[in-house]
Swiss-Prot record:
UniProt biased composition (Gly residues): 25-36, 95-117
A GO biological process held by the record: dopaminergic neuron differentiation
Alphabetical list of PROSITE patterns matching this protein: ENGRAILED (PS00033), HOMEOBOX_1 (PS00027), HOMEOBOX_2 (PS50071)
Superkingdom of origin organism: Eukaryota
A GO term, aspect molecular function: RNA polymerase II-specific DNA-binding transcription factor binding
Gene field: EN2
SMART domains cross-referenced by the UniProt entry: HOX (SM00389)
Predominant place of localization: nucleus
GO cellular component assignments: chromatin; fibrillar center; nucleolus; nucleoplasm; nucleus
Protein name per UniProt: Homeobox protein engrailed-2
Name of one Pfam family that matches: Homeodomain
InterPro entries registered for this protein in UniProt: Engrailed_Homeobox_TFs (IPR050720), HD (IPR001356), HD_engrailed (IPR000747), HD_metazoa (IPR020479), Homeobox-engrailed_C-terminal (IPR019549), Homeobox-engrailed_CS (IPR019737), Homeobox_CS (IPR017970), Homeodomain-like_sf (IPR009057)
Protein family per UniProt: Belongs to the engrailed homeobox family.
Species per Swiss-Prot/TrEMBL record: Homo sapiens (Human)
PANTHER family, alphabetized: HOMEOBOX PROTEIN ENGRAILED, HOMEOBOX PROTEIN ENGRAILED-2
Amino acid sequence: MEENDPKPGEAAAAVEGQRQPESSPGGGSGGGGGSSPGEADTGRRRALMLPAVLQAPGNHQHPHRITNFFIDNILRPEFGRRKDAGTCCAGAGGGRGGGAGGEGGASGAEGGGGAGGSEQLLGSGSREPRQNPPCAPGAGGPLPAAGSDSPGDGEGGSKTLSLHGGAKKGGDPGGPLDGSLKARGLGGGDLSVSSDSDSSQAGANLGAQPMLWPAWVYCTRYSDRPSSGPRSRKPKKKNPNKEDKRPRTAFTAEQLQRLKAEFQTNRYLTEQRRQSLAQELSLNESQIKIWFQNKRAKIKKATGNKNTLAVHLMAQGLYNHSTTAKEGKSDSE
């Protein structure tokens, strides 16, 4: 295909883009279709706008170091900023432009040609290791245009990521793109070696750290977690005095006489009458209420007679409690 052959102007733009500082705010989007003076001036202005720390000689990337995984690139403040703006727009432009280079989509979004944008993408690939996988679905056009950097790749859209794989072989064979390449079925011999080494390293780590618990352990009930300790601690949590929730009230003779007289007058106290009794006898309302409940339950248990409402409900089949304890609860206020 004629579109896959890199143009001389685009190759020169890619070489110059690699010489410029790689961490400009619009780095992945300014690759033009040729080496025009206006675009070169734009690149120089962007280089002048960068801090002096980012322009140190150690931060410049050389063409043979395109491995998509360098620590000096990760430590830059601009790392990962152009993931959505630069590379995804370039990939979308490649998908819209097809084999012609995607000049319509990428130039409209970022101001550069599709093929030139792919050249710049290759130059900035060592800066952002997570940029390349989002552009793989729509990289049918522009990415093969820069395929001359990776030997043995001329099949187009089916192996677009092998371009970055070939560039990665010269540097770091165990980069972060191994997972994405294996997911797309592009893993080669070196990728299988790295996967074996990764699995063996993972097994060694698991052997060296036997105290690591799986995630499901922390998602189960509290009794199944290791942090809850042995299960023999459970009986200790129980309160031995669970039955003695309320202390028994020791009424005086005067209080008992007054309560019995009030009970003879009316077995059921109103709230107002209960409050007045509590103030007169220096008792709590709950103590007076419970005494009246207990007194009614004792009388009912001794006589065995049910109140008229209970008899009426039992005749209709709506009330048939067998024990007197439950019947005593029905009389409670």
